[in-house]
């Protein structure tokens, strides 16, 4: 019992406690160092280099081959990684300070021209061309751009109404609304500016001069304090009021007429505005025809009717017979005849008498002598 106990005690004293390093796997650096030391102990034979490969100098082989003494160098590199390592140092390859920066352009090609150049590794990297291409692309883009930057146009209120004088025209004419909406129209147009006066135009106003008085009709003249307010009011031409009446707005012809040349003022194209009462009076004036007007066809002769009841009667065929008996025998129609009609038919009677006398002579000669 004592031997076993003593033996167990001695075994416990010889065991070592476990550490964190014992649980970790060996690092690749340690394995590579052990592999390098084992490889370096193996004797290597000197290889024979052919004469056609003798132009590869020892300096170039050192340049293209990775450093064996580097602890992070790989024993076997792929073709792609080998090509990238040609133009980039180890510091830039493994995240050094020059990582991501373009490399200088390599102009030298020491391999010369020959049949084996195609099999040789590349001497330039893709990063050697990026900087020059970017610079050339920027230069070409700036020089070959045919368009200049577009300048922003500043809004000029003087070009709002090019056809109207913006410096002096402050009066506008509003039309197209019923008289009961006059106050509402004035309230709507007061939003564009301060209204100095509200005048109504009449047909008797000479030169379109507004006459002060009560507002009547469906149009009026508004005078603003500033020309810009009048321009805004003209731009609102066609505004709807109560969704049923379209109101028009134009510049006042009184002020616009001052800027019109004299040759156009007297023309028939000038704007004229009259009331409905004046148009009705002008339409009611009768047209007087000339009493002595008579066309060759007998149309257009003035006819005077003595009695309104006889206006639809035609007694013209009996008139020559009455005048004939009155002229030959001294009696005829007892109806009163105007002096104007007598003077008119006197000339017709002479021509009728000669024609009738000639017909009687022709009838007598034909009866007596047969011709």
UniProtKB/Swiss-Prot annotation:
Domain RRM Nup35-type: residue ranges:
166-259
InterPro entries, A to Z: Nucleotide-bd_a/b_plait_sf, RBD_domain_sf, RRM_NUP35_dom
Q: Does the keyword Phosphoprotein apply?
A: yes
Q: Which GO terms describe its biological process?
A: mRNA transport; NLS-bearing protein import into nucleus; nuclear pore organization; ribosomal subunit export from nucleus
GO function terms (MF aspect): nucleic acid binding; phospholipid binding; structural constituent of nuclear pore
The keyword Membrane is annotated on this UniProt entry: yes
Q: Give membrane topology per the record.
A: Peripheral membrane protein
> Keywords on this record?
Glycoprotein, Membrane, mRNA transport, Nuclear pore complex, Nucleus, Phosphoprotein, Protein transport, Repeat, Translocation, Transport
Q: What is this protein's record name?
A: Nucleoporin nup40
Q: Please tell me the species this chain comes from.
A: Schizosaccharomyces pombe (strain 972 / ATCC 24843) (Fission yeast)
